[in-house]
Amino acid sequence: MLLTVYLKDKQYYLFKLFREIWPSCTTECRICLETLGTEGGVVGVPDNGLLNLDKMFHAECIERWKRGRNRDPFNRAIKYYFAFPPPTLHECKALLEHTRGFIGDDEMDRVYSLVHQRVTTEDALDVELNFARFFKDDARAVGGGQ
């Protein structure tokens, strides 16, 4: 069933979508080159305010890196670092407050860019709902389905 939804709290909706999409994404820490797990990693917000999820790090790796350097491993001046996907709604709101969107050439960046752009620019969204998952397979209609 296709439903049109008028969003009142876009930040909450983005928070839910960011968490929902993340398990289908794969990227690696750009310092140690190990894959980031389901908990995600850390992304830097540069001066332009555009996130590049292909340039993410483990929290421990970027903390070690920042001890002796002012710039990230890509020689970018970073204004803020955020956990991604944001673990809480509060952190998601802070992230969205300081970013303008997503940039990058890989599939993950394109997916998040489309979702962010769609939610932030549209007043109403078409959402596909699957009501079948809410019912048990052996459920019967009361009154014989009439």
UniProtKB/Swiss-Prot annotation:
Protein name: Uncharacterized 17.0 kDa protein
Alphabetical list of InterPro entries matching this protein: Baculovirus_U-box/Ring-like
Domain of life: Viruses
Family annotation (Pfam families): Baculo_RING
